[in-house]
């Protein structure tokens, strides 16, 4: 049983928490959570890389780039889910399936390109180089996307209120973002291992 002071504390916290999911603050919440989860996924992936490659240090600029690219995706995702909910009204199974299909066919490749192009250019590559990397890794990325996101989005569109959609995706995406960091930086890590003679 929670004490009276505990209940008062929770009510106070809820008072600060609720505005983050309403009105103009919702887009800020969605934007920052998107960047934060992409950065967290990169931190997890870098921790794995450091454990596998002794002497390797954490690349904070890489994590900062992940945060920036994630924040740039936040507004798109915010308005994308609003559009899906406006165009496919309700959470009947037919509409949910349509939302998932449109999300997979439109948003997934768009956000994949956004991620690879944004990260590539922030890491100092030319647009052409970033575009080539996306082309080289697209099918691996897209097949993995189809394995993860349709089921996650079925839950999202069927059970959750619209204001929590981006936050839910950002929480589920922690594992996905770790994978994206791995996929994006895999070649760099392999080159570093070979140069150090640890491959």
UniProtKB/Swiss-Prot annotation:
Primary location recorded for the protein, binned into one broad class: membrane
Cross-referenced Pfam families: Mpv17_PMP22
Subunit structure: Interacts with the large mitochondrial ribosomal subunit.
Subcellular location: Membrane; Mitochondrion inner membrane
UniProt membrane topology term: Multi-pass membrane protein
Family: Belongs to the peroxisomal membrane protein PXMP2/4 family.
PANTHER family on file: MPV17-LIKE PROTEIN 2, PEROXISOMAL MEMBRANE PROTEIN 2, PXMP2 MPV17
A GO CC annotation given for this chain: cytoplasm
The keyword Membrane appears for this protein: yes
Keyword terms of this UniProt record: Membrane, Mitochondrion, Mitochondrion inner membrane, Transmembrane, Transmembrane helix
InterPro entries in the record: Mpv17_PMP22 (IPR007248)
Protein name: Mpv17-like protein 2
GO aspect biological process, one term: mitochondrial ribosome assembly
Function text: Required for the assembly and stability of the mitochondrial ribosome. Is a positive regulator of mitochondrial protein synthesis.
Domain of life of the organism encoding this protein: Eukaryota
Transmembrane segments annotated in the record for this chain: 25-45, 64-84, 105-122
Gene name linked to the record: mpv17l2
